[in-house]
């Protein structure tokens, strides 16, 4: 089968999905909505920077990506303003790229088009001719946050979900929300991790091969809390995370905090200075996957204070490596976390609640140990890569075999 993926080619999630699809013996053409380096496994790579993606409007880290230029530094400083502008100007850019996308479809003749999120990849993919089925993956904040960004975002989200022949998400909540937004309930839907599953063997093997050390960056022999989420406006409440740190240090002065994707970020530097956190925190850049996994193994606790989210791949990787999760109390993460059993859920707007949960976890090593065993079993039961690939294959074959005409409803 020839599958045309529409995704951010810089993203580790995209690259893992490509590897999974290629492992299923399918041909992959990638349309990247961001400029990116070569992607292993694809037969062809085309870049269509919709919504001014060339300026770097989202955060991902991948080896070989272009270094941030002045425009990306400005985006970092004025991230919220830039995001708001994209909600109004981004949809207009689709008018320019739609014709180019349809020409590419006519040229490569894929059997199936799959967009790895709704804005703006799914919106572009919705321009696929009706004779070709399309699958759309929902990310956790696509419907609860981005779709409400402007009237144009709402209209294009509705159009995308009505056009979609199949829907994927990493949480059952998002399939339900997708149906409320116009996806037909009788069409195929699949809940699987967005990164095509967790390969425990690969994680162990690549960690063993990775030679770079944290010895000069992080203190040894102290409790460690890791926040790997970077800055995601409107989704992750890093303001709450930083405000909780002094509250933890009052009771646990030896705890050390590590944040990836925050090195040099003005917002992070401002919080560190204002809250006098120097010596208690390390702001790291985005890390290669093996190094991130090694950090998870070294850390005691994984923190993600999400207000809008699905099931973050970093969450699955963190619990697979033994981290105890302390995460926002949102519906998608309730599908994974039993409070006091294998993690804690906290109100995402309350620094004191987060601090209390961190202190309780750090005071209970048996809780952390038992949770690590439970979470590893959860990964094996619900997110193991081989099992997920088999589910993806069945889903793709069902879409391609049914024919788009029988699956498409006129908006």
Language-model-derived ranges and their functions:
Residues 168, 195, 211-236, 242-245, ...:
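Conserved donor-binding/catalytic core segment of Leloir-type glycosyltransferases
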Residues 324-327:
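Short hydrophobic beta-strand element within catalytic cores of glycosyltransferases
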Residues 339-340, 344-351, 360-366:
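Conserved acidic donor-binding segment of nucleotide-sugar-dependent glycosyltransferases
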Residues 48, 136-139, 154-212, 219, ...:
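Donor nucleotide-sugar binding/catalytic pocket of nucleotide-sugar-dependent glycosyltransferases
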Residues 286-287, 294-299:
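Short alpha-helical donor nucleotide-sugar binding micro-motif in glycosyltransferases
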Residues 269-287:
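Nucleotide-activated donor-binding/catalytic signature segment of Leloir-type glycosyltransferases, i.e.
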Residues 307:
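Aromatic "clamp/platform" in nucleotide-sugar-dependent glycosyltransferases that forms part
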